[in-house]
Amino acid sequence: MKSVEDLGDLRGKRVVIRCDFNVPLDGDKITDDGRIKAALPTLTQLHEAGARTTVLAHLGRPKGAVDPKYSLAPVAKRLGELMNLDVKLAGDVVGPSATKTSESLADGEIALVENVRFEKGETSKDEAERAELAQKYASFGEFYVSNGFGVVHRKQASVYDVAKLLPSAAGSLVAKEVEVLEGLTADPKRPFVVVLGGAKVADKLAVIDNLLKAADTLVIGGGMAYTFLKAKGLEVGDSLLDEDSIDACTKYLEQAKAAGKQILLPVDVRVVSDIDFEARTVGQIDVVPADEIPSDKMAVDIGPETEKAYANAIKGAKSVFWNGPMGVFEIKGLELGTKAVAQALTEVDGLSVVGGGDSASAVRTLGFADDQFGHISTGGGASLELMEGKELPGIAVLKENN
């Protein structure tokens, strides 16, 4: 993949950059600007190089039609504050306003067009429809920079098709993500420990398949742990259970044993009989051994003994990849397992990687700073697909364009 430096002198040149600004909003207030901050190094580089930069980005899922609640206005405002620049926002995506805004940029200026998902062609499965929209994006620049790692696993007009039309490069954010994550699966420093949590085993089957080959130890928490416990013949009460994945879990346990690898499962869990996920309230929380979960209770977090065992495995590693919380961390009293894992990652003497999505928001919610970890991925789905060994369309096209 080419870097921005490889594009040569950009002063006065028009550059189109795809960023991932899909930030959480409360009304029109951004509640976590991590993704905007992650884009700053490359945007600052373009600004200082004197490029005339048009930014493509999406927010939410407006389904191919204009929806004011998904406007990029809060993003443009926050980006301007962070860069101490006047960042203009066009009134449309590829219409007269976007064209005029892009064409009137001076050297070093930055503008956003509106949410690319306001255009039906952006996420279309019809290649011709995407290509037609990509032509319009390409009219905004002489070069294309891909800097939205959270979307590189999508074959979309602003990620994939436009990169075929212009000389293209990876921004520093995408380049670092690919380097770190591909390095973990190809040649990790050992011991290599993978921590997987989250609700469903089904979502992680391909990841487990690939990482069982690469990792020395697999640490399992979150809702998916109870399907593994069931596969070992234990009763899990009212806990989340992915019946369709029990056989797969049995197979993984057997494969790990045959290959001399460890799969760590909870030895104790926190259980409740009364929980309201919407209101984020919970009744009495008890700790029970993992093989004694009462039939009328739901396990909702790993227990203190498990926290210690998992922390020890993590702290002894030279490389750690973590994706998915250990429990319902959004509810007070059920964040302890996730917090213990996050704390252990900060103490790793080696590379600690937080794999985007819920894990990234969990560490920030729980008060950890980004620089306490080796790398926090900006892509949940993208980081998992890369760890599965899949070829990501938005990366493949940059490598071809080399």
From Swiss-Prot:
InterPro entries per UniProt: Phosphoglycerate_kinase (IPR001576), Phosphoglycerate_kinase_CS (IPR015911), Phosphoglycerate_kinase_N (IPR015824), Phosphoglycerate_kinase_sf (IPR036043)
PROSITE patterns xrefs: PGLYCERATE_KINASE
An annotated Gene Ontology molecular function: ADP binding
Enzyme class: transferase
Chief location of this protein within or outside the cell: cytoplasm
Family label: Belongs to the phosphoglycerate kinase family.
Protein name from the UniProt record: Phosphoglycerate kinase
Keyword Kinase: yes
Species this chain originates from: Cutibacterium acnes (strain DSM 16379 / KPA171202) (Propionibacterium acnes)
One GO process term, biological-process aspect: gluconeogenesis
EC number: 2.7.2.3
Source species, domain of life: Bacteria
Name of one Pfam family that matches: PGK
Record PANTHER family: PHOSPHOGLYCERATE KINASE, PHOSPHOGLYCERATE KINASE 1, CHLOROPLASTIC-RELATED
Binding site for substrate: D20, F21, N22, R35, H58, L59, G60, R61, R117, R154
Subcellular location: Cytoplasm
One Gene Ontology cellular component annotation held by this UniProt entry: cytosol
Keyword Transferase: yes
Reactions it catalyzes: (2R)-3-phosphoglycerate + ATP = (2R)-3-phospho-glyceroyl phosphate + ADP
Transmembrane regions listed in the UniProt entry: none
Subunit structure: Monomer.
Disulphide bridges: none
